[in-house]
């Protein structure tokens, strides 16, 4: 058994005083070096707006690859590519089938292959691999170990370890595709959170263990991923060996929300990443104050690796303003291709799905109808990430099918507008109503508007003259702290009943949210 190194209270106080002095110097240096005259311009957070939780990142030369928890959305584990750490493009997805709720992946690269270790809630931990981040990806391999949030670390002698939640680790087989029975052990107790901080508890999760220079670093998520605004954080410890003992940083936490007045709440679950010239950043997730139902968004923040061998934060709230771009910026509008209906890259189903239901040709999505309501029809969804937006689509439905637009949290909580054999309808849990009008209409345009949490619906018979429907709803409560499940409120399309529905001329617009 390996135990964490603990200092006494006096040593802790000395380290904290020393850390405070060092931090003042670092902040002064950062202020001088982080002006808006960066040769690459500036960026603002989030770098991925909307529900992109538990980011894990790896660098291959000048290319960066990142993935996130996919939870109950499928296809799962979308892999993103960037060359500037700010603009990201989806390039593949690692999971072809629904395994369950997929949590906290860890993407890594070794021996010319890419690996993603991940948790399936209630089933354990798995791994997939590929020769290229563009895929194709292997079938999932069961690692035969419980816990959550796996992360691989390869020791100097080639021994492979899988670090897990609760400060535990287990040895992996030589190929990294299974675990060695009887080797599970607890190696780290976590950074002790101050008693007066308001969190969800210790919740020692999201380990990222890697060697940088002479040190091994244990980056951990603590405090709980949701709950109060000040819950989450990133703590860090180090050791001369992957076997420990682990010494907590005097600068902890590296990332944290200190006030409910901050823009970004529950900041945590971070991964360190460097640039080719040796500058360091951390990617992590956070809820946005006032827009909790957007989910946990991906943020990027510079950090400093000091001469003392510790990673230092450069300020408590630098993430809220403009920051110098790490690298030459390359623009990419991830919503510009929504009209192509790229399922798996831009669009995803909720839970299980039958891929044969969907076909795309010349910008028209043909979707076979299924289920009795949005609850069991596996709606096709996308991430918006904006405070105010609207989306619309032209619909041609078979007389036996219903079709519509939704804002979807899960199979119990959703809102939307549709049309079917009985006329126009409002989707809302089991309380949706049929308007008993336009029963014979099979060709229609529908629009949903989400203007800073207030949702309204519109329809048109010619795509030019629009009519507002007679309902509206406020949706800020559609979030994890109310409904659980770690989901977000996603816009999308649904086809219900029997027959087919054709969706075409899809349009998405960001509205002025000021």
Language model features with spans:
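Intrinsic low-complexity/disordered segments
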Residues: 1-2, 13
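Aromatic (phenylalanine/tyrosine) cluster motif
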Residues: 3-5, 28
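Bacterial N-terminal signal peptides
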Residues: 20-29
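Bacterial N-terminal signal peptides that target proteins for export
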Residues: 8-21
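Carbohydrate-active catalytic/glycan-binding domains of CAZyme proteins
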Residues: 32-514
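Intrinsic disorder/low-complexity segments
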Residues: 15, 30-33
